[in-house]
Regions:
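Active-site hotspot residues in diverse enzymes, especially metal/ion-binding acidic/histidine motifs
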Residues: 6-11, 145-162
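C-terminal binding/interaction regions
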Residues: 125-149, 164-167
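Conserved phosphate/pyrophosphate-binding and hydrolysis machinery centered on Walker-type P-loop NTPases
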Residues: 1, 83-86, 143
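Long, low-complexity, intrinsically disordered segments
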Residues: 182-193
Length: 193
């Protein structure tokens, strides 16, 4: 979720939008996922609808709520606002970029480039949980090329590598420390980066 926040902030700056509200949308878009994980067999998915229902009772801005609902196809909520389009566009891509970094010997997002992400996109066995069609459709929805989209999100993640735990291995071969405690993961990917 932190990677999605970083990417959303980058797009907000680029598009002249409110950086804080866009960042918050990225940060909270999956806040209810652990409580309501997606079940491929279920006809009615609770994530993100249950979380949005709760936030609505607390008076959260409708633009953020609509973006959160729109990032999941199965909600049927159209992505009308730029915020909603951007959230959909960056969600899967941040997971793919995270996976690309974690398979590097250095475990550093600084060692990932656009060409490498494009190459890994073609490998369906790599980061299987990442929906490549969503990545492509997201760039199209924003009216930019796929390479430009990857470049924007990658640059945002590289600029925030330390807080994302993607700054690489320390000289001793250990995962880098994340500010506030803990270490960066050395293998695997999160469900949503």
């Amino acid at each position: 979720m932190l990677a999605v926040e970083c990417a959303m902030r980058a797009y907000a700056e680029r598009l002249g939008q409110d950086v804080e509200s866009w960042g918050v949308a990225g940060l909270i878009h999956d806040f209810d996922y652990e409580r309501y994980p997606n079940d491929a067999q279920a006809a009615d998915q609770e994530h993100p609808a249950e979380g949005v229902r709760h936030l609505r009772t607390l008076g959260w801005p409708e633009e953020i709520l609509e973006a959160v609902l729109g990032h999941a196809h199965y909600t049927g909520v159209p992505r009308v606002s730029l915020m909603a389009k951007a959230l959909f566009a960056v969600d899967e891509l941040t997971g793919l970029i995270t996976a690309c970094a974690l398979v590097k010997p250095s475990k550093a997002v600084a060692d990932v480039d656009v060409a490498g992400v494009r190459k890994k996109m073609k490998d369906k066995a790599f980061a299987r949980g990442v929906n490549r069609d969503d990545v492509i459709q997201g760039a199209e929805a924003l009216g930019i090329s796929l390479d430009e989209h990857i470049g924007i999100v990658l640059a945002a993640m590289q600029a925030n590598a330390q807080s994302l735990g993607l700054s690489g291995l320390s000289p001793g071969g250990h995962a880098s420390e994340i500010p506030g405690g803990g270490t960066a993961p050395s293998t695997g990917t999160s469900p949503d980066a």
